[in-house]
Amino acid sequence: MSGNNLSGNDEFDEQLRMQELYGGDPKEGDTQNEPSGEAHSLGQPPDDTPYEWDLDKKAWFPKITEDFIATYQANYGFSSDGASSSTANVQDANTKAVEEPPQKEVPETPDSKRKGEKRKAESGWFHVEEDRNTNVYVSGLPPDITVDEFIQLMSKFGIIMRDPQTEEFKVKLYKDDQGNLKGDGLCCYLKKESVELALKLLDEDEIRGYKLHVEVAKFQLKGEYDASKKKKKCKDYKKKLSLQQKQLDWRPERRAGPNRLRHERVVILKNMFHPMDFEDDPLVLNEIREDLRVECSKFGQIRKLLLFDRHPDGVASVSFREPEEADHCIQTLDGRWFGGRQITAQAWDGTTDYQVEETSREREERLRGWEAFLNAPEASRGLRRMDSIAGSERPGPSRMRHFSEHPSMSNMKAQEATTGMAFEETIDENKFEKAEEGGESEGDASEKDAKEGGSDGDHPEREGGEGCSKKENEEGCPERALEPEEGNPQTEAQENGPEREARKKSKMDYEKNGFSKESEDNDLGKESEGEDSLKKESEDDDSEEESEEDSSEKQSQDGSDKEIEENGVKKDVDQDVSDKEFPEDVEKESEENETDKSEFDEGSERVLDEEGSEREFEEDSDEKEEEGDDDEEEVVYERVFDDDSDDIEEEEEADEKECEDADDKEEDNDIDEKLFDDSDEKEDEEDTDGKKDDDASDKVFEDNSNEKLFDEEEGPNEKLFDDSDERGTVGNVKEDGSQSTDSSFALSSSDDDDDEV
């Protein structure tokens, strides 16, 4: 079987080779010569591969023979020991077959032998491609030209390449054997476009009378070339080439001189504030930022401004555009005072982070406060909002932050800034003292007839107090605003009806005499009364206090209410009048609770009616005085309500009339003094003192009325009457029209504060 198989294979192989050589179809042998004698094997066509039937898989598969394995291995370049027999058989078949034509052998190249190895460049002269040639040859140069001058000339047309090893420009000026310049040179550009630009612009140009000629450089071998002298390439050559490519970027050239670092543009300001300052009023942070921006903008353009509100050192940073601007800011602000603190200014070191993160406890407290605010009722929330607004608008040390102008006076500025609240309190006290002095000077003349018309002025004043109390939450009453500052809580004096009447009668006398200024009693509104003025005068003058005590004893014995004023002047008051005034006061208080703001305009008529009822119960001597007072009061009330619409000329005419009434009133005062002398002989000395005081006060009031009061009355009265119209109170109008020169200063400043609120 083995012999048959070998003979069959040899014949099959021979047929295949003959088919390849001659292109003919090999003859297929008989089916008997097939290697397998199985019944299921079928004869195949001569040009096809023989197949055999697989009984297990029930399919035809190519018949695997030695020839099939040999052809398979020959196609895939695989050789094994098992294929040696097939190769031997092939050689035997070649001897039998027709000789094939000889094939030309391809000589093996060194590339095929050295696959994967880098080809070494042959040592010899180099040739530069035209597309990559960026060298320019310039001839006709002046013999005295220098390398720097040549570089400056050639750099006008492009970027000159630098040597990657020496970092010098690739330019060369040729010299002869003796070292003298020949007048030609070479320049190597970075880009090909620079060569074309130099050929167009520099060719045929003249320098110092020498005509230049420019052309593309051509390199030729002259003599013998020694390859051993060629420079070796540096390992970092590629890195330096990449650095040269950066010269083509659109980057501005660096300025000459030392380059300053970026963090030198930032200024750090310390001790600007304290973190606790922002807990009560967080809006202070915006105020400090705005003040700092305004101050630092004087030194240059500000790029960024930050306040590190949680930093314990009170740090703020200001970033300028240029370092020079930051230097100017540091030089100016270092050591200056801001908000009562001496600040320090320095440049940022570039590493310190001044941002302080919020701790978990602080975050919980902040969220707890916010939750309490959200859960609070809307009414209390609105009150808090109004309180915060009012507190933010009130002048205080937190609102007085500013930079000191003179650093040399830093100590004085520090004391002033730290005692800002004390300055405000002293200002208020000075206002109070001025108003008090003004009230004492006016009291000598105005309070002589304090008893007369006391009940007449009671209603308007109390009505004005009610109007002020109603509007206290909305607009704020200026009289109440002055109470805590001046420290005059006088609730006991309000309960005394006769004393209140005496005070209001004195106000009526001020209007009659034409003294349209505010006294200390009017500054304090409804709370300043005759009893307090009695206490103040007792501290100034002991003799007046004794006279007041005697008069008070006399009132208790006789059963009549006699008012004792600041000058010690006493008035004749009947017991019947005083007995009737007390029930009238009770009736007035009940009427005040029922009246609204709309009834303030009718206060003058109601007061006149009450005066008429009082005159019925008075004696004949008092009736004359009351009648004169009624006429004068009518003129005063008409003037008070007409001043808002009258011009300045009408006010001056009214003032002249009041001056005449003041002269008449002085005569009445003399009559009252005489009556008082007849009724009581023990008080002659006090009467003489009262007359002296009256004469001195008359002179003072005459001078003030002729020179100062009428000139100053126009501006303040108009403002005060406007305020009275807005509030709708009669008492306030009367007080505004009867203030003194000293107290008008205090009230004018307080009115300004109220307007701001």
UniProtKB/Swiss-Prot annotation:
Q: Where is the composition biased (Acidic residues)?
A: 539-551, 610-635, 643-671, 678-688
GO-annotated biological processes:
double-strand break repair via homologous recombination; mRNA splicing, via spliceosome; protein localization to site of double-strand break; U2-type prespliceosome assembly
InterPro entries attached here?
Answer: Nucleotide-bd_a/b_plait_sf, RBD_domain_sf, RRM_dom, RRM_dom_euk, TatSF1-like, TatSF1-like_RRM1
Q: Where in the cell is it found?
A: Nucleus; Chromosome
Location of Phosphoserine modifications: 388, 404, 408, 410, 441, 446, 519, 528, 556, 560, 578, 598, 604, 613, 621, 645, 679, 705, 724, 749
Stretches assigned to the RRM domain: 134-219, 265-350
- From which residue to which does the signal peptide run? none
Region annotated Disordered, chain positions: 1-54, 80-123, 383-417, 432-757
Region U2AF homology motif (UHM), residue ranges: 260-354
Explain the purpose of this protein: Component of the 17S U2 SnRNP complex of the spliceosome, a large ribonucleoprotein complex that removes introns from transcribed pre-mRNAs. The 17S U2 SnRNP complex (1) directly participates in early spliceosome assembly and (2) mediates recognition of the intron branch site during pre-mRNA splicing by promoting the selection of the pre-mRNA branch-site adenosine, the nucleophile for the first step of splicing. Within the 17S U2 SnRNP complex, HTATSF1 is required to stabilize the branchpoint-interacting stem loop.
Which named protein is this?
Answer: 17S U2 SnRNP complex component HTATSF1
Gene, per the UniProt record: Htatsf1
